[in-house]
Amino acid sequence: MTAQTQIDHVIIVVQDLERATSDYSLLLGRRPSWQGSHPDHGTANTLFKLDNIYIELLAAAGQGMAADIVTEMLENRGECLGGLVFATPNVEAFVAHARASGLAVSDPMAGSGIDKISGATRRWHNVFWDPTAARGLFSFCIQHDPASELPEAAITQGGAIYGVDHVVVKTSSASAAKRFYGDQLGIRLALEQHVPEWGGTQLFFRASSMSIEVIASETAHEQDELWGIALKSEDIESTHQRLIDAGVNTSDIRAGRKPGTRVCTVKSHTCGVPTLIITDRS
């Protein structure tokens, strides 16, 4: 089946946007691509466009639907990896496919954001579905206006992060994950394997040069959890040393689970998001 969606960005909900922006500028070794607001929805954001997707830091900044979602997440989970957003080049075709696959989606809704530095405006159309369709995980689909290209987050330091390798979703139902990500969103299931030491199944859905790693276990919560993120570095030694020198709490570099990879864990400056840095030398 032709893929209906790619991965557009991940959302990290934060309490203090200025602090979070400083932390992620340091972590990524990049300057923000965009620092804006959504006046109609009561939120403000900072965006970092990487090679494959972008990272959005999102905070409540007024009254509105999005502000309510952010506030509820902060009350229930604290700062966290709060949302996974998919992209389509044809929003009408996506709506038709989703509805035919049993995903009850909204009609496309126009949206816009304003950059506080340049005054530029970006425009898009969003398609929403009830969070129960994703077993509690906040997600939606977006088609960006062709004239609203997001600039790349400029590299400011050596050992900068260049992309997202994967995000981790915890679930109690592998079959529900295959239906949602595979059948309804049209994302390719690249690998499914049983992992006895975890007591469950591991699924890898591939899009946008990254994976959604779904860990399905009977011990998982009833609702799915968007849990952690792995960031790509071309030179993990350089990235690791840069972070250590800046006072970021970072583990030693070690061999990754995938042959040929080396990883380290970042333990601070992540807004509570479990974060791994990975270099693939295979």
Where are these regions (language model features)?
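N-terminal beta-strand motif that seeds the catalytic metal site of vicinal oxygen chelate
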Residues: 1-17, 79-86, 140-176, 226-229
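Short, low-complexity cationic-aromatic patches
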Residues: 2-3, 16, 47-49, 73-79, ...
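Core segments of cupin and vicinal oxygen chelate
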Residues: 12-61, 100-102, 106-122, 161-162, ...
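A short, acidic/glycine-rich surface segment
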Residues: 33-34, 65-69, 149-153, 214
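Active-site-adjacent scaffolding segments
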Residues: 51-86, 91-110
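Vicinal oxygen chelate
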Residues: 56, 92-160, 203-208, 212-213, ...
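Intrinsically disordered, low-complexity segments enriched in Gly and acidic/Ser/Thr residues
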Residues: 199-245
